[in-house]
Amino acid sequence: MQKSLSKRQFFILSYFAYACTYIARLNLTIASPVMQEQGILTSSQVGAMGGAFFLCYSVGQLLNGFLGDLYPPRRMVTTGLLLTALGNILIGFLPPAGVVLILWGINGFAQSMLWGPLLRALAARFPGNKQAEIASCLVSSVGVGSVLGILIATAAISFQDVRFAFLLPGLIAVLAGGAVFFFFHVPCPCGRTDRPSGSHSASRPGAHRSIRARLSDAGFSRRRFSALCSPRLMILLLPAMFHGVLKDNLNLWAASYFADTYSLPLAELSFYVLAIPILTLLGRLVYPFLLRLCNGREHTVSIHALSVTALCLIPLCLGDVAMLPAAVCLSLIAAAISVVNTSFLSVFPTRYAGCGCVSSVVGLMYFATYLGAVISSILY
């Protein structure tokens, strides 16, 4: 019988798995200016890649958020990581631009398979009074993965060539997928454990269950669907979409913004671009403190963070901003938006753990967020 990981080990594995998705996403931020310079892609094709990623990611979140409450988290997370690895590794062979676009869209869909199931798994492993705090700690993996993604891509391009900016993240995702497959065991609602299937799998009652059976097995009821259609949730979808306008486009276009506006070489460019995920990480790290400061009211934390975002956008919208103030404003926006993002996509969904639809709520919130990202990517 396989021994389950301790809660700490389980959290570390979840942290590593989700950080890998940003390692295999933020590599495009550094690679895109080099690919444009080498004539591999045009700026419009890079924009199309961003739009394809966000579209596939948002649609995938809606679908996979629902499936994440039906299927074992280990299966969902492993599949997502291996598809992410496949997309990045194939892009590393520099196929035609149309193929790159499709592969990056697949990468977006694959990465949508992780967060909902991960939150569901953590909600199953940790008690209710710890769920919001654990979720707000897990989301700092976004900042860690973003920083590592930029550093790995920069090192790969500097010491090898641009193709390694995709090959290395792909290999790291393979490693994470293997670790999740063998060690990510989650207690299921009906008492089973989410373990790798062996020779006895055919005898399991759930080996070939229908969707209806899975719905019944997971306890899906009118109460759950009522929770998903509640006015409280519907009202939050609009601000979630607005915060999505800034969230990922900030990372996608930061390198191009500094390169085009201030004509920076790669070494200096990486320094300024790196400030954004570092401040994003800082925002996520201070979130548990901010949540306690606001007596556990995530909406109050979000209102303050959105106010900071608005203040920092004003000088950028006025134009003619020097490089250092622009970097400071963009970094503060990144930190504030990461705080809002933690509220919407991590803490708020855990409030639905009692209804058994954490992953589904994550899917809805992510869909709204990345719908905003798709719209803004097209406009940019």
Regions found by a protein language model. Give the residues of each.
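Residue-level signature of mid-helix packing/kink "hotspots" within the transmembrane helices
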Residues: 26, 54-62, 146-147, 277-285, ...
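Conserved MFS/SLC helix-loop-helix module at the cytosolic interface between two early adjacent transmembrane helices
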Residues: 59-95
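Helix-to-loop junctions at the C-terminal end of transmembrane segments
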Residues: 61-72, 284-296
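Helix-loop-helix hairpin linking two adjacent transmembrane segments in secondary transporters
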Residues: 138-188
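A late C-terminal transmembrane helix in Major Facilitator Superfamily
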Residues: 355-380
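Cytoplasmic helix-loop-helix junction between adjacent transmembrane helices
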Residues: 103-142
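Extracytoplasmic gate region of multi-pass secondary transporters
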Residues: 28-29, 231-284
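C-terminal transmembrane helical hairpin of 12-TM major facilitator-type secondary transporters
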Residues: 298-344
